[in-house]
Amino acid sequence: DKEAVDWWIRRCQEWKEKYPVVLPKHYEAGDDEPANVYAAIKEISKRVEEDQITVVGNGSACVVGGHAYEMKKGQRFISNSAIASMGYDLPAAIGAWVADHTKDIILVTGDGSIQMNLQELQTIVHHHMGIKIFLINNGGYHSIRQTQKTHFHEPLVGIGVDSHDLSFPSMEKLAW
């Protein structure tokens, strides 16, 4: 019944305005952040066209992407939320491009997740795939870092720069 559906849509819009997922404080940059991930995701989403596909990775890309990405008509937002299989995102973006390469595919990933399939960057180059990669470089495995800090405190182990026992390639050097 159209009237009931319209009522429900209005009700959901009221709740969305009354209880926003992203608050103004989320857009405030922290002292230790070179960029604000919420602001970056929102800005990326503003520039993505209708009917375009965006793939997000794990951790910050998935959580913040799910909160701050503003969808437009016909867009697809592909994530593996709650599955947490790191490295899913780059092959998923390649698969999305193979399925529909009429428009560029947008990929938002983290420096930890992209390392699981870093070699696939060559696949993108070799096949001239239209995949635009936005990388959240937070110095390692951020979700693991947060879990360790919240539940176990110090010492941090196996997370990247902060733990001093794991290194990552220079993402700046890999960018083209």
Each language-model region and where it sits:
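Thiamine diphosphate
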Residues: 1-2, 64, 69-176
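Terminal amphipathic helices with adjacent charged low-complexity linkers/tails
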Residues: 1-10
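A residue-identity detector for tryptophan
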Residues: 7-8, 15, 97, 176
